[in-house]
């Protein structure tokens, strides 16, 4: 089992730098997830930078994390179609990073919200 962490990253992938990864290692974790709010914002140079930082510390590439809200089951067809585009973009980013998986939530039709 690989023990990674999410809570030591102050934001999305843009905030991951050497200091963040060193802090993760000092706490005894072996990697840190990569949160991606906008998969279109990650360019090839960003992929190279992230992979280099992880590789230089012996961190395996972790899972990526996309939308927590998730609209795959939204009642509005256009909302669902946009979410499907997002999922496809996340799959592409995860593949480019060499990530073993991406974590996404399908959503909820619960009127009180998906967390209740």
What are these regions (language model features)?
Residues 94-115:
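Active-site groove signature of glycoside hydrolases
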Residues 1-100:
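N-terminal pre-domain/capping segments
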Residues 75-78, 112-116:
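Surface-exposed cleft-lining segments at the edges of enzyme active sites
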């Amino acid at each position: 089992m690989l023990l990674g962490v999410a809570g030591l990253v102050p934001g999305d992938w843009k905030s991951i730098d050497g200091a963040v990864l060193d802090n993760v290692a000092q706490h005894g974790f072996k990697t840190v997830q990569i949160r991606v709010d906008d998969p279109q914002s990650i360019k090839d140079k960003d992929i190279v930078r992230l992979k280099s930082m992880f590789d230089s510390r012996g961190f395996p590439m972790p899972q990526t994390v996309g939308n927590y809200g998730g609209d795959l089951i939204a009642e509005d067809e256009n909302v669902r179609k946009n979410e499907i585009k997002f999922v496809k973009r996340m799959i592409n980013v995860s593949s480019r990073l060499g990530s073993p998986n991406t974590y996404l939530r399908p959503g909820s039709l619960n009127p009180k919200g998906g967390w209740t």
